[in-house]
Amino acid sequence: MAKTQAEINKRLDAYAKGTVDSPYRIKKATSYDPSFGVMEAGAIDADGYYHAQCQDLITDYVLWLTDNKVRTWGNAKDQIKQSYGTGFKIHENKPSTVPKKGWIAVFTSGSYQQWGHIGIVYDGGNTSTFTILEQNWNGYANKKPTKRVDNYYGLTHFIEIPVKAGTTVKKETAKKSASKTPAPKKKATLKVSKNHINYTMDKRGKKPEGMVIHNDAGRSSGQQYENSLANAGYARYANGIAHYYGSEGYVWEAIDAKNQIAWHTGDGTGANSGNFRFAGIEVCQSMSASDAQFLKNEQAVFQFTAEKFKEWGLTPNRKTVRLHMEFVPTACPHRSMVLHTGFNPVTQGRPSQAIMNKLKDYFIKQIKNYMDKGTSSSTVVKDGKTSSASTPATRPVTGSWKKNQYGTWYKPENATFVNGNQPIVTRIGSPFLNAPVGGNLPAGATIVYDEVCIQAGHIWIGYNAYNGDRVYCPVRTCQGVPPNHIPGVAWGVFK
């Protein structure tokens, strides 16, 4: 029997509060898969696998809507391939579509192409945004259904649910036919979002002394980082969070750097630490963007940094413009260093002070140009010579992946991984979830690895144990295959 709108609204509120009447609601902190976080009370785990995934919420919701007659199958993207029964209708997400409360939102394009993502419309919103109720947005599969404002990225379909006749439903209204994708902006225009994270950082008590310019070692844009991190919670932030994330035309202010610290330099929070003294900004997409696109992302960071330096009364110099590698052993900012000095810290090790100064001086010049002229242009180093950004550049930054007979993608990589706040089950001999268990990698443990693999929906690192065993440890989820794979949130910190 169809539910009334009032009943639907009550159900959604109960999901959000963690009090819904469901046999699949987690009653107390629970964990059976160390690949994910510990599920909190209120999380929905409808199938008993992989903790509280996004689809678990929909499986429970549809069972309730259909009086336990329809149980969904497949991943999130598969929901538009099946029928839930009478009264359910599948709609393509068009420019004129304003969803109604209770509808199911299905994401199948862009970064959601591999498995999809899914949630429930909590507030239909408008053309630009709506409020979604969802699970597993943070990748840890550990939270109860949570509300988040979404911008329609990757959303391809809505599933309309049946509503009992005679109830009041929010009327669909016409909206402008403008594309949900923001129109290209002028080069000098930056959109700055101040959608701060849902955690209060320690206060510095004074303005920052300067800016640390990072490379994100990821594939997301500034806006995508905002979507995934704004409500991620402490467990994710403890693995590292910067004040700002910049890409072409867009900067997300995750934390107000004027008086709050961030965890971006990895050297603690003491009065002399980089975390305490400096603001931090990530140049985004350092592992996925073309050289041309990455340079545009850098320009957004330089322009924004110039604005902040004016606000804070700072002059760009070697004391105020800093590199992550000045505080701890790391290759960051690896992509910028390759482009502007010709030195690759990933393959060549730690650079000399002269090379670091060369990169800092380039950053300083770019920031000064924006402060003095309001504009600047990129230059890169190619074959030892400086050239304009129009010079073709095709340097691979992700290494050469190979595929073995078992379908595992692998490549050599020498680095260090520091586990987060949850133990991880390791495997012996191969990167498969059904391989022999090697034990638990404790929370906070450090391992030095020499190989990276992609298999079974995860990214693994490989290393030799003291007893001679070859051990593989999953360190994040992964969608797709190289070179277009999309890594999930890391379960620790790479150095």
Swiss-Prot record:
Q: Which cofactor does it need?
A: Zn(2+)
Q: Which PROSITE patterns does the UniProt entry name for this protein?
A: CHAP
The molecular function GO annotations come to: metal ion binding; N-acetylmuramoyl-L-alanine amidase activity; peptidase activity
Known catalytic reactions: Hydrolyzes the link between N-acetylmuramoyl residues and L-amino acid residues in certain cell-wall glycopeptides
What InterPro entries does the record point to? Amidase/PGRP_sf, Amidase_domain, CHAP_dom, Papain-like_cys_pep_sf, SH3-like_bac-type
Q: Name the Gene Ontology biological process terms.
A: defense response to bacterium; peptidoglycan catabolic process; proteolysis; viral release from host cell by cytolysis
- Copy out the cofactor comment: Zn(2+) is required for amidase activity.
Residue numbers binding Ca(2+)? D45, D47, Y49, H51, D56
Q: Which UniProt keywords apply?
A: Antimicrobial, Bacteriolytic enzyme, Calcium, Cytolysis, Host cell lysis by virus, Hydrolase, Metal-binding, Multifunctional enzyme, Protease, Viral release from host cell, Zinc
Enzyme Commission number, as recorded: 3.4.22.-, 3.5.1.28
**Superkingdom to which the source organism belongs:** Viruses
What is one Pfam family matched by this protein?
CHAP
Q: Where is the composition biased (Polar residues)?
A: 378-393
Q: Which residues form a coiled coil?
A: none
Supply the domain comment: Contains a cysteine-histidine dependent amido-hydrolase/peptidase domain (peptidase C51/CHAP domain) at the N-terminus, a central amidase domain and a SH3b cell wall-binding domain at the C-terminus. The CHAP domain contains a tightly bound structural Ca(2+) ion and it is present at the N-terminus and is associated with the endopeptidase activity. The SH3b domain increases the CHAP domain activity.
> What family is this?
Belongs to the N-acetylmuramoyl-L-alanine amidase 2 family.
Task: State the protein's name.
Answer: Endolysin LysGH15
Organism (species): Staphylococcus phage G15
The primary gene name is lysGH15
